[in-house]
């Protein structure tokens, strides 16, 4: 049976039936084990081959050991290349359709045997590969290109197959393809590495992604801004901020100037890593690099400060933003309404809210919710209730946050019945209460002496399948403890030891934040052993709990588990870990962690550097104190005044008064400290 490929050509392409009348050894495309690696050996028969069976890697014959000599022989005996290919005479769509009907390698090779003498250009074959999305067929097609048709190996062909293999998450085979490229003396290019790095990174395999990045740098293949930016964004989304910072450092070391998007991402990263000064300094660096900060840059920095309750710093950034005439947007204004409220600047918050429309900025539900909360916290209950009802009269959107805010306001006025009525009202309007709604009403009822109603609601929530969040559990525990029902509170805590209706990570966080060290420890160890701890913040939460309770051995235990799991600690965790090593007198380990993190490109806040100085001092290693002091002294990112004061204090504590005096005199000489009056 034959099908016609193109009306202008006398060539025809055999369409093979899906079942064959004879038996042969083959691997069907649909049944190849996913876990099979490229370097495993299988016996496969291939048509158009001088040997009926032979050992092959998963998809192809093993490349000859002596690659150089084999390629020389190939060139020597290669037929004269036709100047005119048959590309335009072959219908690629029909050829692809025929390829899709093949069930194994033998059928595919037989189908393509018509073109074994390379009547089609390598460009045509690469295009064919790029349109074949099935990773198994694309591998077999690549084998035919190199082993049957004897095309010169092409990095473009490998790149296309790598893409298909990685889309199918066949990472072991991707490794094998890369090794095969090396064996064929092909140099992986930027696209090769970009595909590998991005694919491994998207799957959260950052150690592997960074390993590919290291190989790329060793091969002197230059990365581009897009590649580094993608890695930074992937790290940020996975909350691995130390790796994002490390990649950003590599980007700049490569001589690439970050663009506005990269800078804005890094402002967010530094903020999430609690490196606030570094986040602020990026604005300065952007100006120096000729990349003007925009509204997103400033609003991102504002968000960083607000999330960490640094409201005065946010006020300073907003003033700078207005000074440089950077346009304000709704996000920025909403943030600043919140900031004004947090700083008890209610008039400023009120003025900004009511002036939004004058600036041609239409307030949204977030704007209304924020000013409602500001009114409530300032105990301007009349204004809050008036605005809430005004929203309803003007059909302005209200959501669960709006109602939660108003329920909380009624709780402050001890009007628990009105709060209860609001819960019923929101449900009648089709607004579903959430965990915060329930925890707020339970808290209000508890304070009003309506514990029976609170307990009944909590029990209904547990049996109804509603998500029980940290706040809700803690609220009920506190409600029981307030009235002396310690048995009920302990039963809830006991339930959290073996949670069957909430994730273990949630249980750990609840217990840790409640200061329940023993219970949190028990659940954490069980969860870690069973591989349930996936969130990096859970490790940080446990380290923080142990550090607060001076359980330094446990701090080190969790840190080592964290590193075993492949997570990078943030600067706060590093500070607590260094302190724990110091308390345990394990100075060498502290020094190792400090150096390793710096080599990875971590940027430490001053407190970490100062803590390391303190550890060296505790060890009586003043040579290291002086060495680190001199290095930090030349670092423009370190607060010079605080550095000198810390070092002087360390020398003074060790009775090295001459050295302490020397450091203080150096401060005066450099104008850091005012000289004594004459």
Curated annotation (Swiss-Prot):
<dbReference type="Pfam" id="PF01535">
    <property type="entry name" value="PPR"/>
</dbReference>
<keyword id="KW-0934">Plastid</keyword>
<feature type="transit peptide" description="Chloroplast">
    <location>
        <begin position="1"/>
        <end position="64"/>
    </location>
</feature>
<dbReference type="InterPro" id="IPR011990">
    <property type="entry name" value="TPR-like_helical_dom_sf"/>
</dbReference>
<feature type="repeat" description="PPR 11">
    <location>
        <begin position="535"/>
        <end position="569"/>
    </location>
</feature>
<feature type="repeat" description="PPR 12">
    <location>
        <begin position="570"/>
        <end position="604"/>
    </location>
</feature>
<feature type="repeat" description="PPR 5">
    <location>
        <begin position="294"/>
        <end position="328"/>
    </location>
</feature>
<feature type="repeat" description="PPR 14">
    <location>
        <begin position="639"/>
        <end position="674"/>
    </location>
</feature>
<dbReference type="GO" id="GO:0009570">
    <property type="term" value="C:chloroplast stroma"/>
</dbReference>
<feature type="repeat" description="PPR 3">
    <location>
        <begin position="224"/>
        <end position="258"/>
    </location>
</feature>
<dbReference type="Pfam" id="PF13041">
    <property type="entry name" value="PPR_2"/>
</dbReference>
<keyword id="KW-0809">Transit peptide</keyword>
<feature type="repeat" description="PPR 10">
    <location>
        <begin position="469"/>
        <end position="503"/>
    </location>
</feature>
<keyword id="KW-0150">Chloroplast</keyword>
<dbReference type="GO" id="GO:0003729">
    <property type="term" value="F:mRNA binding"/>
</dbReference>
<feature type="repeat" description="PPR 7">
    <location>
        <begin position="364"/>
        <end position="398"/>
    </location>
</feature>
<dbReference type="GO" id="GO:0031425">
    <property type="term" value="P:chloroplast RNA processing"/>
</dbReference>
<feature type="repeat" description="PPR 4">
    <location>
        <begin position="259"/>
        <end position="293"/>
    </location>
</feature>
<comment type="similarity">
    <text>Belongs to the PPR family. P subfamily.</text>
</comment>
<dbReference type="GO" id="GO:0009658">
    <property type="term" value="P:chloroplast organization"/>
</dbReference>
<feature type="repeat" description="PPR 2">
    <location>
        <begin position="189"/>
        <end position="223"/>
    </location>
</feature>
<feature type="repeat" description="PPR 13">
    <location>
        <begin position="605"/>
        <end position="638"/>
    </location>
</feature>
<dbReference type="InterPro" id="IPR002885">
    <property type="entry name" value="Pentatricopeptide_rpt"/>
</dbReference>
<feature type="repeat" description="PPR 9">
    <location>
        <begin position="434"/>
        <end position="468"/>
    </location>
</feature>
<feature type="repeat" description="PPR 1">
    <location>
        <begin position="154"/>
        <end position="188"/>
    </location>
</feature>
<protein>
    <recommendedName>
        <fullName>Pentatricopeptide repeat-containing protein At5g39980, chloroplastic</fullName>
    </recommendedName>
</protein>
<feature type="repeat" description="PPR 6">
    <location>
        <begin position="329"/>
        <end position="363"/>
    </location>
</feature>
<dbReference type="GO" id="GO:0009941">
    <property type="term" value="C:chloroplast envelope"/>
</dbReference>
<keyword id="KW-0677">Repeat</keyword>
<dbReference type="InterPro" id="IPR051222">
    <property type="entry name" value="PPR/CCM1_RNA-binding"/>
</dbReference>
<feature type="repeat" description="PPR 8">
    <location>
        <begin position="399"/>
        <end position="433"/>
    </location>
</feature>
């Amino acid at each position: 049976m034959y099908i016609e490929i193109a009306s202008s050509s006398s060539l025809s392409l055999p369409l093979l039936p899906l079942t064959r009348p004879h038996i042969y050894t083959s691997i069907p495309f649909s049944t190849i084990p996913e876990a099979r690696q490229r370097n495993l050996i299988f016996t496969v028969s291939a048509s158009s081959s001088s040997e009926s069976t032979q050992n092959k890697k998963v998809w192809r014959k093993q490349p000859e050991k002596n690659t150089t000599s084999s390629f020389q022989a190939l060139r020597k005996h290669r037929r004269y290349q036709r100047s005119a290919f048959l590309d335009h005479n072959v219908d690629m769509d029909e050829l692809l359709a025929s390829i899709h009907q093949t069930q194994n390698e033998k059928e595919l090779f037989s189908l393509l045997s018509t073109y074994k003498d390379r009547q089609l250009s390598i460009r045509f074959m690469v295009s064919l590969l790029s349109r074949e999305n099935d990773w198994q067929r694309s591998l077999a097609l690549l084998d035919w290109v190199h082993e049957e048709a004897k095309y010169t190996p092409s990095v473009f062909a490998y790149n296309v197959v790598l893409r298909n293999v990685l889309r199918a998450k066949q990472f072991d085979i991707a490794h094998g393809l890369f090794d095969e490229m090396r064996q064929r003396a092909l140099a992986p290019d930027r696209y090769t590495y970009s595909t590998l790095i991005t694919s491994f990174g998207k799957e959260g395999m950052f150690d592997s992604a960074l390993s590919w990045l290291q190989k790329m740098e060793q091969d002197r293949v230059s990365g581009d801004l897009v590649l580094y930016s993608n890695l930074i964004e992937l790290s940020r989304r996975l909350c691995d901020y130390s790796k994002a910072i490390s990649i950003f450092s590599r980007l700049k070391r490569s001589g690439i100037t970050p663009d506005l998007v990269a800078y804005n991402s890094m402002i967010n990263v530094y903020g999430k890593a609690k490196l606030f000064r570094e986040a602020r300094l990026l604005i300065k660096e952007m100006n120096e690099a000729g990349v003007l900060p925009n509204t997103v840059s400033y609003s991102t920095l504002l968000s960083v400060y607000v999330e960490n309750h640094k409201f005065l710093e946010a006020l300073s950034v907003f003033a700078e933003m207005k000074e440089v005439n950077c346009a304000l947007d709704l996000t920025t204004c909403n943030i600043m309404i919140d900031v004004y409220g947090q700083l008890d600047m209610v008039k400023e918050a009120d003025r900004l809210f009511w002036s939004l429309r004058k600036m041609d900025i239409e307030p949204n539900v977030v704007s209304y919710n924020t000013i409602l909360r500001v009114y409530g916290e300032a105990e301007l209950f009349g204004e809050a209730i008036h605005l809430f009802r005004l929203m309803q009269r003007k059909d302005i959107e209200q959501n669960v946050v709006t109602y939660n805010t108003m329920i909380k306001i009624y709780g402050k006025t001890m009007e628990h019945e009105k709060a209860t009525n609001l819960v019923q009202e929101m449900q009648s309007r089709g607004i579903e209460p959430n965990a915060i709604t329930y925890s707020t009403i339970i808290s209000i009822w508890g304070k009003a002496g309506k514990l029976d109603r609170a307990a009944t609601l909590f029990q209904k929530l547990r049996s109804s399948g509603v998500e029980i969040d940290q706040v809700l559990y803690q609220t009920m525990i506190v409600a029981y403890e307030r009235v002396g029902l310690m048995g009920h509170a302990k039963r809830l805590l006991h339930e959290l030891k073996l949670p069957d209706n909430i994730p273990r990570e949630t249980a750990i966080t609840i217990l840790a934040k409640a200061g329940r060290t023993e219970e949190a420890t028990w659940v954490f160890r069980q969860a870690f052993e069973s591989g349930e701890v996936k969130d990096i913040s859970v490790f940080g939460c446990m380290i923080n709990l142990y550090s607060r309770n001076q359980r330094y051995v446990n701090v080190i235990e969790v840190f080592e588990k964290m590193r075993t799991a492949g997570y990078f600690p943030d600067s706060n965790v590093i500070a607590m870990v260094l302190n724990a090593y110091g308390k345990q007198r394990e100075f060498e380990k502290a020094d190792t962690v400090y150096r390793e993190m710096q080599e990875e490109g971590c940027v430490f806040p001053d407190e970490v550097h100062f803590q390391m100085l303190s550890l060296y001092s505790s060890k009586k290693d003043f040579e290291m104190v002086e060495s680190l002091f001199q290095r930090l002294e030349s670092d423009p990112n370190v607060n010079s005044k605080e550095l000198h004061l810390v070092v002087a204090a360390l020398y003074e504590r060790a009775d090295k008064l001459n050295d302490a005096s020397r450091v203080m005199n150096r401060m005066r000489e450099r104008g850091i400290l005012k000289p004594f009056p004459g």
